[in-house]
Every structure is written in structure tokens, then in C-alpha cells.
């Protein structure tokens, strides 16, 4: 019983000293991260409309501004924005095509760089943006993004079942 008591005391001393060491290394963390995931695939979070003209692109931007305003009021300071969806992107890329979530047509630009816009709007509100990329899977074998990636890098993608 005495040994158990000694082990118990040593364990708590070690745990307490670890906390003091950790605090000494990082006494003032930059800040507390209060983050949300902002999903773009299928318009789950944003966008809820397609940018097929200047007017509709502005409406799409307003949707994001409204979301960010609500997040700011909720004291969110970090947005994890889905920027790459199944081998397609929401920003201009020389490697992968535009995702259809913005324009409604896979491979078609919405007329603006949605990632740049999101970064600028988040920074206006004192928020950070972190890119959330979906790396695997790239999508169904015959989806637009997968086909484009296969054309450019045929050895990069391996078909794993009937759908890809």
C-alpha cells in the first residue's frame, strides 16, 4: 500500500511539473481559436445561389458577407473554408478546374476569385481563413474534376471500384 501511495504522489508531482514546464514554454498563447467549417460542396453552407452574371455574383458575395457577419457576432475568429472539392477548386488554378458550386457549371469561372474574396472579407472582420482541401477521393471516375485531373496526370489517379 505504501508503494502505491508513493507512485500516486510521484505521478501527481510529474503531472504538475509538466504543466509548469508547458506554461513556461508558452505562457501566452496567441489567442483562443474559435472556428467553424464553411462547406462549399453542394451549397451546404455557401453559396446558395449561382454566379452566372455580375448581379448574381454580387448576390453570392452578399450571402458570404451575411454569414461572416453572423460568425463575427458569435465571436468566431477562424474560418476553415472548403477551397478544394473533389479535384475542383473555388479559386483560379492552373492544375484543377473551377468547381460548379459557384457558377452552376463545372469548369466555369464565377467571374471572381471566391477564395480571395473570402480572405479579404474575413480579414475585414479580424478573422483568419484556413484552406480546407478535400484530397481524397477526387470524385467519381467520370466526374468533371476527376476527368480533368486524369488527363493532366494520368498516373496520379487509380480507379478503385466501379464508380472510381
Q: At which residue positions do the language-model features occur?
A:
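Sec-dependent N-terminal signal peptides
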Residues: 3-13
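Aromatic- and glycine-enriched glycan-recognition loops and surfaces
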Residues: 53-74, 101-125
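Residues that line or immediately flank small-molecule/substrate-binding pockets and catalytic motifs
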Residues: 8, 40, 83
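Short, well-ordered coil/turn segments that N-cap beta-strands
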Residues: 30-33, 75-77, 123-129
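Aromatic-lined carbohydrate-binding/catalytic grooves of carbohydrate-active enzymes
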Residues: 74-110
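N-terminal module-boundary/linker segments of secreted carbohydrate-active enzymes
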Residues: 21-30
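Active-site-adjacent "subsite" loops/lids of carbohydrate-active enzymes
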Residues: 31-33, 39, 43-62, 131, ...
